């Protein structure tokens, strides 16, 4: 399952919508469920919208929390966005109590996950993961992140190892994956471009 925060853009007027989505298929064609964005899609047609993945997460809770951070009151008031309320999920407000419960759930899940220890950072050499305490020496050949060698795709094929903390950038035509401490190249901005095919599905640009 993929969990991410995305940005949908109206290619006609440039207006945008930010939301969170969880899916087994990155090319599912999902553009958003908010009232305003749905009305816009109905008016302009799906082919006049594009979706960019802003950031990927390991859990749905983490994605919700990031979404809550970036959908600010200023953004909601802006005429450049379709978002109507904090949270961005169909205009539903996430209360303080709900956010607290999600944080607690996320913390427990992390604490109880096999091979993980709170307070430590995961490093990988591409085949093996180790957890290092703050201040401890990182072995040669290891970099910050986690590899998932046994992860399966929907078709049962192995997925290329992924590294936690990396992020996508694009220059309007090309996508690049940047390491956690990497520098964004000139002319590139954060986000991953996704193109829509003739069937309405998204594919990598």
Swiss-Prot record:
E.C. code: 3.1.-.-
Keywords: Endonuclease, Hydrolase, Magnesium, Nuclease
Cofactor(s) essential for the protein: Mg(2+)
EC class: hydrolase
SUPFAM superfamilies xref list: GIY-YIG endonuclease
GO terms of molecular function: endonuclease activity
Superkingdom per UniProt: Viruses
Domain GIY-YIG per the UniProt entry, residue ranges: 1-84
Keyword Transport: no
InterPro entries for this protein: GIY-YIG_endonuc, GIY-YIG_endonuc_sf, SegE-like_GIY-YIG
Disulphide-bonded residues: none
Reported function: Probably involved in the movement of the endonuclease-encoding DNA.
Family: To endonucleases of group I introns of fungi and phage.
Protein name: Putative endonuclease segE
Taxonomic lineage: Viruses, Duplodnaviria, Heunggongvirae, Uroviricota, Caudoviricetes
Name of the gene encoding the protein in the UniProt record: segE
């Amino acid at each position: 399952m993929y969990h991410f925060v995305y940005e949908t853009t109206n290619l006609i007027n440039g207006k945008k919508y930010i939301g969170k989505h969880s899916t087994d298929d990155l090319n599912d064609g999902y553009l958003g469920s908010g009232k305003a964005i749905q009305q816009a899609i109905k008016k302009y047609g799906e082919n006049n919208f594009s979706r960019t993945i802003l950031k990927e997460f390991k859990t749905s809770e983490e994605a919700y929390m990031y979404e809550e951070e970036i959908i600010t009151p200023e953004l909601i008031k802006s005429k450049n966005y379709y978002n109507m309320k904090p949270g961005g999920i169909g205009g539903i407000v996430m209360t303080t109590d709900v956010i607290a419960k999600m944080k607690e759930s996320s913390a427990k899940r992390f604490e109880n996950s096999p091979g993980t220890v709170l307070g430590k950072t995961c490093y990988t050499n591409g085949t093996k993961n180790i957890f290092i305490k703050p201040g401890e020496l990182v072995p040669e050949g290891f970099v910050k992140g986690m590899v998932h060698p046994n992860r399966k795709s929907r078709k049962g094929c192995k997925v290329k190892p992924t590294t936690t903390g990396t992020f996508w950038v694009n220059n309007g035509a090309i996508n690049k994956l940047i390491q956690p401490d990497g520098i964004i190249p000139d002319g590139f901005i954060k986000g991953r471009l996704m193109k829509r095919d003739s069937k309405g599905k998204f594919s990598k640009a």
